Amino acid sequence: MTASAVLDLVKDLIARPSVTPDDVDCQMLLAQRLERIGFQCETIARGGVTNLWARRGAGAPLTVFAGHTDVVPPGPRDKWDSDPFVPTERDGFLYGRGAADMKSSIAAFVVAAEEFVAVHPEHPGSIALLITSDEEGPAVDGTVIVCDELRQRGEQLDYCIVGEPTSTEALGDVCKNGRRGSLSGRLLVKGVQGHVAYPHLARNPVHQLAPALTELVAIEWDQGNEYFPPTTFQVSNLHAGTGATNVVPGEAVALFNFRFSTASTPGQLKARVHEVLDRHGLEYQLDWELGGEPFLTPRGSLTDALVSAIQAETGLQAELSTTGGTSDGRFIARICPQVIEFGPCNATIHKVNERIELSSLAPLKNIYRRTLENLLLAD
């Protein structure tokens, strides 16, 4: 197959305005193609979210490609140079919402699977795709419920490639072999409202909160490790008061977030925060939300297979990185021992005029195919 096979499929996918959680039959299109080459396809739907689990083969190892058909809203359409849902070729690029994040990755892997099966119809092991329409949104009815279903059924995943756009300057320069965890807190500090002229009759929660926050911001939570930078603490929102200048507020609210490595646990971070707040004598309520645990795939079979495929196709030695935000890899890592993320350049994701280089489509497909060969056909 030629690069046009990937391009044609990408265009079909971009033309479907699949803003979270609407799939707009993207997965039906994928399933139809996969069924023609022997995949057993299953839809797992909940809460308006569509998920596709497609598997070919019953043996081990099971190599999975994970991705999402949903896209973020395009924003003001008059800011785009062309309709975000009309795939447009211009100046060596393909424009459209989802071009980089991540419909090109999905199309490239589907065509890679078609090529691989055509040459190796009786290949060892199994190939599967896990596709959701709920990655860019709440992510509560998407990949996480498919992983729960697979766990209950006893389907053992061995390797997973998540098609997130990880490349930065050139296709193949960066892979993500892990991601930091995300832990958020909503801190409500209680005071006593009153008149600013009579502070002795009030208790200002802002004045009480400020030194505690100053201490939290200055803490070195850990030093990171070989794969992760140190854990970070960031205050994202502060709110207090009625809007009047003569009223001491009765409460103050701070929202904050940790991006943490495997060098710290959520329990350790929570305990240290509570220790600081208690020591400052605050009357408070603190609600926690764990967005995801960190995961890490050390160098091994999967990283070697992908890195060697990238080098064979592009000549680049890919960097293994754990930077960036969370992804669905955090759910898959619970049931799969080796997870890695790899896809096209990410410079325009979520932006107006999102695009991908046309010349990168064939190499992306070839890298995925070579990775399958390295994992399933190795002696």
Curated annotation (Swiss-Prot):
UniProt keyword Amino-acid biosynthesis present: yes
Pfam families noted in UniProt: M20_dimer, Peptidase_M20
One Gene Ontology biological process: diaminopimelate biosynthetic process
Top EC category: hydrolase
Any one GO molecular function term: succinyl-diaminopimelate desuccinylase activity
Cofactor note: Binds 2 Zn(2+) or Co(2+) ions per subunit.
Keyword entries, A-Z: Amino-acid biosynthesis, Cobalt, Diaminopimelate biosynthesis, Hydrolase, Lysine biosynthesis, Metal-binding, Zinc
InterPro entries on file: Bact_exopeptidase_dim_dom (IPR036264), DapE_proteobac (IPR005941), Peptidase_M20 (IPR002933), Peptidase_M20_dimer (IPR011650), Peptidase_M20A (IPR050072)
Residues involved in Zn(2+) 1 binding: 68, 101, 164
Cofactor (UniProt): Zn(2+); Co(2+)
Reactions that this protein is recorded to catalyse: N-succinyl-(2S,6S)-2,6-diaminopimelate + H2O = (2S,6S)-2,6-diaminopimelate + succinate
Active site: 70, 135
Quaternary organization: Homodimer.
Cited function: Catalyzes the hydrolysis of N-succinyl-L,L-diaminopimelic acid (SDAP), forming succinate and LL-2,6-diaminopimelate (DAP), an intermediate involved in the bacterial biosynthesis of lysine and meso-diaminopimelic acid, an essential component of bacterial cell walls.
Protein name: Succinyl-diaminopimelate desuccinylase
Organism annotation: Bordetella pertussis (strain Tohama I / ATCC BAA-589 / NCTC 13251)
UniProt lineage: Bacteria, Pseudomonadati, Pseudomonadota, Betaproteobacteria, Burkholderiales
